[in-house]
Amino acid sequence: MKDLEFAIQDVIGETKNTDLERVVKQNFNGETNEVGIYLALARLAQRQGYPEIAGVLKTIAWEEAEHASVFAELNGMIQEDIFENIKQM
């Protein structure tokens, strides 16, 4: 089955000031929350002697962060200019 993706995922700010902005923000918040939980679980697994499980959980966390980044772009949480974004960090 072909991978599905947002048709507008590479357009920064596409959902900003639209009816979708709130839903996209909720998805961003959910994904970033999941990143924290997965990384916390990875730390716990590492401390308890399960490095392989920790590695899997870190991979899942990275995938959730990737999802969050799409939502951040859609809602215009970053600008088109990479250097302006870096200055604001």
Give short role names for the model-derived ranges:
Residues 1-89:
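Non-heme di-metal
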